[in-house]
């Protein structure tokens, strides 16, 4: 199992989680290919993190499976914008921490059946 972590990326966690849910459980090569054609900033960021996780474990992208893809909220950068009558309102610029775990294809099947057995109570 290999992991990759990207912290403090200027990206909304809610928007990134939409893309992260789509690639969870996918083949790494297929996930990277599908993320290339997704017109979203989160897709570009997640594609790089998945590629990094595959490279960290020196795995082949064709046989690697994404076990978990998690996006956690980072600190929020607070900025202000001038408004009428001398006031200022706050602008929130959220950041995210992206975490990806990748395993070889054969290991994934055993862990999936293990999770299924746990869910059934066996």
Swiss-Prot record:
Q: Which GO terms describe its molecular function?
A: rRNA binding; structural constituent of ribosome
Instruction: Please name the InterPro entries in this protein's record.
Output: Ribosomal_uL22 (IPR001063), Ribosomal_uL22_bac/chlpt-type (IPR005727), Ribosomal_uL22_bac/org-type (IPR047867), Ribosomal_uL22_CS (IPR018260), Ribosomal_uL22_sf (IPR036394)
Keyword hit for Isomerase: no
Chain intervals for the UniProt region annotation (Disordered): 103-122
Entry-linked HAMAP family: Ribosomal_uL22_B
Q: Which UniProt keywords apply?
A: Ribonucleoprotein, Ribosomal protein, RNA-binding, rRNA-binding
Q: What does this protein do?
A: This protein binds specifically to 23S rRNA; its binding is stimulated by other ribosomal proteins, e.g. L4, L17, and L20. It is important during the early stages of 50S assembly. It makes multiple contacts with different domains of the 23S rRNA in the assembled 50S subunit and ribosome.
Q: What is this protein called?
A: Large ribosomal subunit protein uL22
Give the gene name: rplV
From which lineage does this chain's organism come?
Bacteria, Pseudomonadati, Campylobacterota, Epsilonproteobacteria, Campylobacterales
Give me any GO biological process, just one: translation
Question: What CDD domains does this protein's entry cite?
Answer: Ribosomal_L22
Q: Which domain of life is it from?
A: Bacteria
The similarity comment for this entry is:
Belongs to the universal ribosomal protein uL22 family.
Instruction: Quote the subunit structure annotation.
Output: Part of the 50S ribosomal subunit.
Q: Which GO terms of the cellular component aspect does the record hold?
A: cytosolic large ribosomal subunit
Q: Which PANTHER family match?
A: CHLOROPLAST 50S RIBOSOMAL PROTEIN L22-RELATED, LARGE RIBOSOMAL SUBUNIT PROTEIN UL22M
